[in-house]
């Protein structure tokens, strides 16, 4: 398997998967792990922000966030707004990859989204995008 490089040397790149669908989280996390990444999971935006705060206390930061937009609780757009408000002083800038059924790139560009993947998607295509941001 292709072993991507991490901008935080000595560790596998962390990829935070934020999606309310357990089947998607499981499939994506499994593929990421097989490809040499350390997947972390959250079911919605507030859980993702809590994970990031806890990980930051340990000096751990995701290199990439794979984010669903339509979730119960804090959705993807609100998560992006909160993350953007906290700024780079709180977290190094991870690459934001939105995974959505309805691609609307106009509202995402101002919130730091680097790439949009439209559902349904092939796992190999998702891994190619993740590799692009971690090598």
Provide a role label for each language-model segment:
Residues 1-16, 22, 26, 57-59, ...:
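Non-catalytic signal-transmission and effector/linker regions of two-component phosphorelay proteins
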Residues 18-19, 42, 65, 99-100:
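Conserved sequence signature across two-component system core domains
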Residues 26-34:
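Charged docking surfaces used in two-component/phosphorelay signaling
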Residues 41-54, 76:
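Helix N-cap/capping motif at the beta->alpha junctions
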Residues 50, 77-91:
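Short amphipathic alpha-helix used as the core "switch/output" element in two-component signaling
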Residues 68:
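Active-site residues of response regulator receiver
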Residues 71:
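Receiver (REC) domain active-site loop signature in two-component systems and cognate sites
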Residues 78, 91-94, 101-118, 124, ...:
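Alpha4 helix (beta4-alpha4-beta5 surface) of REC/receiver domains from two-component response regulators
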């Amino acid at each position: 398997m292709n072993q991507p490089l991490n901008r935080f040397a000595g560790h596998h790149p962390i990829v935070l998967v934020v999606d309310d669908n357990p089947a998607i989280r499981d499939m994506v996390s499994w593929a990421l792990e097989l490809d040499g990444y350390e997947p972390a999971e959250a079911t919605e935006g507030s859980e993702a922000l809590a994970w990031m705060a806890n990980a930051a206390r340990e000096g751990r930061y995701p290199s990439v966030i794979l984010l669903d937009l339509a979730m119960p609780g804090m959705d993807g757009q609100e998560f992006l707004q909160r993350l953007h408000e906290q700024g780079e002083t709180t977290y190094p800038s991870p690459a934001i990859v939105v995974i959505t059924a309805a691609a609307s790139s106009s509202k995402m560009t101002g919130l730091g989204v680097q790439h949009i993947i439209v559902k349904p998607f092939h796992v190999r295509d998702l891994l190619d995008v993740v590799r692009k941001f971690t090598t």
